[in-house]
């Protein structure tokens, strides 16, 4: 939500949601559609584009993200790593961008993100590889990479982000936070 508001300050935004078959996606996708229909976004957000990039053929069927059994509340970020997630998402969305003459992809990793596919070196390398492979310039920006979550929340407050329409949960109950996973813990902190 904050990323969309931030990017929309000076350009139209084409939001993209990529389904991978993960347990939380149905609730997340429904709330994303509601969020993007909120008055704050209406003047600069294009309709949500849905893409598919299933991972059930590469992650084991017992993987917590597929089954909806996330690690517990006290789990550190490093325990919820989804191998290759950003590589897959960026590859998929970059093809969409090339076909639609979009050059900018915004991602929202925060300071302290421990994952190898969320580093400046990774984003720079994959942007170069995708630009070469697609014969289309791809610029991957990460405007919050030096910010902590609380800084992003404060920024979102200045934009008037409707937090009640956001979801940060790995095992939502209908459209509500489960209150038991590490993403719910982060949200409360």
Predicted regions and their residues:
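ATP-dependent adenylation/nucleotidyltransferase module used to activate substrates
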Residues: 1-160
């Amino acid at each position: 939500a904050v990323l969309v508001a931030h990017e929309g300050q000076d350009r139209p935004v084409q939001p993209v949601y990529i389904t991978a078959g993960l347990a939380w996606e149905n609730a997340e996708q429904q709330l994303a559609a509601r969020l993007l229909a909120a008055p704050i976004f209406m003047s600069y957000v294009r309709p949500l584009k849905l893409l598919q990039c299933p991972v059930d053929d590469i992650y084991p069927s017992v993987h917590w993200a597929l089954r909806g059994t996330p690690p517990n509340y006290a789990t550190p970020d490093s325990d919820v790593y989804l191998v290759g997630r950003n590589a897959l998402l960026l590859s998929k969305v970059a093809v969409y961008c090339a076909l639609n003459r979009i050059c900018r992809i915004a991602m929202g990793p925060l300071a302290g993100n421990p994952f190898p596919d969320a580093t400046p070196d990774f984003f720079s390398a994959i942007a170069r590889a995708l630009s070469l492979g697609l014969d289309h310039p791809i610029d991957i920006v990460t405007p919050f990479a030096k910010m902590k979550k609380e800084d992003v929340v404060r920024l979102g407050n200045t934009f008037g982000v409707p937090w009640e329409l956001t979801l940060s949960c790995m095992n939502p109950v209908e459209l509500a936070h489960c209150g038991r996973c590490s993403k719910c813990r982060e949200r409360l902190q």
